[in-house]
Structure formats: C-alpha cells, structure tokens
Swiss-Prot record:
Other comment: Negative results: does not degrade beta- and gamma-chains of fibrinogen.
Protein name, per record: Zinc metalloproteinase-disintegrin-like daborhagin-M
Cofactor(s), by name: Zn(2+)
Source organism of the structure: Daboia siamensis
Activity regulation info: Inhibited by EDTA, EGTA and 1,10-phenanthroline. Addition of Mg(2+) or Ca(2+) increases the casein hydrolysis rate.
UniProt tissue specificity: Expressed by the venom gland.
Keyword Cell wall biogenesis/degradation applies: no
Superkingdom of this protein's organism: Eukaryota
Protein location: Secreted
Family under the similarity heading: Belongs to the venom metalloproteinase (M12B) family. P-III subfamily. P-IIIa sub-subfamily.
Protein keywords: Calcium, Disulfide bond, Fibrinogenolytic toxin, Glycoprotein, Hemorrhagic toxin, Hemostasis impairing toxin, Hydrolase, Metal-binding, Metalloprotease, Protease, Secreted, Toxin, Zinc, Zymogen
Cofactor binding note: Binds 1 zinc ion per subunit.
C-alpha cells in the first residue's frame, strides 16, 4: 500500500536513522 510507504518515511525513527547515516558519512 502506498499509504504505508510514506508512513515509515515520516516516522521519527527513520528520520533519526537518516541523520545518523549522513553524520557517519
């Protein structure tokens, strides 16, 4: 479901992981 895809993108945990990945790079 397309609604479930953006849901995980808007998740706070996903955002934190994204920042960590960028910070680690």
């Amino acid at each position: 479901v397309a609604t479930s895809e953006p849901n995980r993108y808007f998740n706070p945990y996903s955002y934190v992981e994204l920042i960590i990945t960028v910070d680690h790079s």
